[in-house]
A protein has these predicted regions:
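Nucleotidyltransferase catalytic core that binds NTPs
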Residues: 2-210, 214, 222-225, 242
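Short interaction-hotspot residues at assembly and binding interfaces
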Residues: 218-244
Length: 244
């Protein structure tokens, strides 16, 4: 009888060891970006990576200056976070963690997250968010130099996803989303049906539009002599993947 008890005890110990040290570890997808603002194109990327990974981490970087504004209102990391929460809740997507990085660029934020001080458990497989469009995955060509040796980086060129397009067939663009919000147009195609006003409220645009309307009304009532306006030369912006 004692031999039977010994055998059972050994089996229990083996099972406990297996539970404590799972074979293969977890897979975590990291999707970095400034997200100014986040939109359904970003959400689709999260959805695709959620099918490949056990958990998706959306890493919001913190630019040194407010380079993206709408009607004078900067799109802060807090506002980006609120819009993300709305999008994820509407889509019913769980297993997504929203985190803010103090680093100014998405790439720097990612390297900081996966380095020797990474909060990820040893043995975790890492997917770095990237689009198949335009060789976007090449941004991670140096990632192997920064990743914690205890983590396993999956090849970005193999895990990159196909970017979604808007209903019109046009690619999603944060620039276009900002422009539509600035011009007080319906931007539901970027944020979901009936969500334009919610996004305006999060970004603090409602009060700005009301103030501009009041100022315009006052200008019409008062005397206004024609003023010559000098056109400002528009600065050319460097091209970058607006998916992020």
């Amino acid at each position: 009888m004692s031999k039977l008890y010994d055998s059972i005890e050994e089996l229990i110990i083996e099972l406990e060891d297996e539970d404590g040290d799972p074979v293969g570890g977890r897979t975590v997808a990291i999707i970095p970006g400034a997200f100014k603002p986040p939109h359904l194109g970003h959400l689709d990327m999260v959805r695709q990576y959620a099918e490949q990974a056990d958990e998706v981490i959306v890493l919001i970087s913190s630019p040194l200056r407010a380079s993206r504004v709408i009607l004078g209102q900067p799109i802060s990391t807090r506002k980006s976070m609120e819009i993300w929460e709305m999008l994820l809740d509407d889509a019913g997507i769980s297993d997504v963690k929203l985190e803010v990085s103090p680093k100014p660029s998405p790439v720097a934020a990612t390297y900081d997250y996966i380095d020797e001080n990474s909060p990820l458990e040893p043995g975790t497989k890492i997917i770095l968010g990237a689009s198949q469009k335009g060789g976007d995955f090449k941004r991670w060509r140096s990632a192997a130099k920064y990743v914690n040796p205890a983590l396993e980086l999956l090849p970005p060129e193999e895990t990159a996803v196909i970017p979604a397009n808007r209903p019109s067939g046009e690619p999603y663009s944060a620039t276009d989303a900002r422009k539509m919000l600035e011009q007080d147009e319906n931007a539901d195609e970027f944020f979901g049906e009936g969500r334009t006003e919610t996004v305006r409220s999060i970004l603090g645009l409602d009060s700005q539009i009301d103030e501009m309307s009041a100022m315009a009304g006052g200008a019409v009532q008062g005397y206004g002599a024609p003023l010559g306006t000098k056109k400002r030369k528009k600065k050319k912006q460097s091209e970058y993947n607006e998916l992020y």
